[in-house]
């Protein structure tokens, strides 16, 4: 079941997440993963959740994530409360990737979709179990924009510039 504008964000969606901490800000520092209840956390916020095939991969690292970091002030100006990036990598890798990109605090959450469970449930994961490149904009629990890229290395519909035009 893929999601589309007008749908409710599903209930019971949990991701794995390591919250950023000042005392564990070095890339080699290790935090403790927690369950991040996305259904609850996204219920009363405007959220941009973008997914990609994997941390530290070429298109994701060179273009996708850096553009969201750069465009964060513009997204906030358009009323976005939370930006989150999602991949099948475990929470430790996602946490290190956030640190490698200089993201501190909860400006952008680096979330793990263990075994691509959520992405598979909406039909947006490949046969290898990697998340597709996609974006969901959720406003108070309702999907207002949903798009999946046509190919793994495509970066059009889910890029920050395109999402800004949808807000």
UniProtKB/Swiss-Prot annotation:
A Gene Ontology biological process term: cellular response to oxidative stress
One Pfam family it belongs to: Redoxin
EC number: 1.11.1.24
Catalytic activity as recorded in UniProt: a hydroperoxide + [thioredoxin]-dithiol = an alcohol + [thioredoxin]-disulfide + H2O
UniProt keywords, alphabetically: Allergen, Antioxidant, Disulfide bond, Oxidoreductase, Peroxidase, Redox-active center
GO MF annotation list: protein homodimerization activity; thioredoxin peroxidase activity
InterPro entries in the cross-refs: PRX5-like, Redoxin, Thioredoxin-like_sf, Thioredoxin_domain
SUPFAM superfamilies: Thioredoxin-like
Residue intervals of the Thioredoxin domain: 3-167
CC terms in the record's Gene Ontology section: mitochondrion; peroxisome
Active site: 60
Family: Belongs to the peroxiredoxin family. Prx5 subfamily.
Subunit text: Homodimer; disulfide-linked, upon oxidation.
Note: The active site is a conserved redox-active cysteine residue, the peroxidatic cysteine (C(P)), which makes the nucleophilic attack on the peroxide substrate. The peroxide oxidizes the C(P)-SH to cysteine sulfenic acid (C(P)-SOH), which then reacts with another cysteine residue, the resolving cysteine (C(R)), to form a disulfide bridge. The disulfide is subsequently reduced by an appropriate electron donor to complete the catalytic cycle. In this typical 2-Cys Prx, C(R) is provided by the other dimeric subunit to form an intersubunit disulfide.
PANTHER family listed in its UniProt record: PEROXIREDOXIN (PTHR10430), PEROXIREDOXIN PRXA-RELATED (PTHR10430:SF30)
Function field: Thiol-specific peroxidase that catalyzes the reduction of hydrogen peroxide and organic hydroperoxides to water and alcohols, respectively. Plays a role in cell protection against oxidative stress by detoxifying peroxides and as sensor of hydrogen peroxide-mediated signaling events.
Protein name per Swiss-Prot or TrEMBL: Peroxiredoxin Pen c 3
